[in-house]
Amino acid sequence: MPERRRFERATVLWSGHLVHGDQALACLIVNISAGGAMVRTDDATICPASVTLRSARIGDLAAEVTWRKNNEMGLKFLDDDQTVAALIGKALR
């Protein structure tokens, strides 16, 4: 089956938070690309559809939840691909 992703993913284990309003849900960023990320949380069902992924390594990125399974979620970044790619590249150095 051909790969459907537009961007190459980097496997990482970065701590972060999914922020919505004044609420923040701790998460572990498992992989990341210019287009989005896969994160793990204690309970993916309590996270709203629109969030900000906050990480000390990459800052804040606006995102939409595209899928959920058990304690994992897929995020699609809403920021410009090139901007996100630059942030990720800097964090991976």
Place the predicted regions along the sequence by residue.
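Structured alpha-helical
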Residues: 1-93
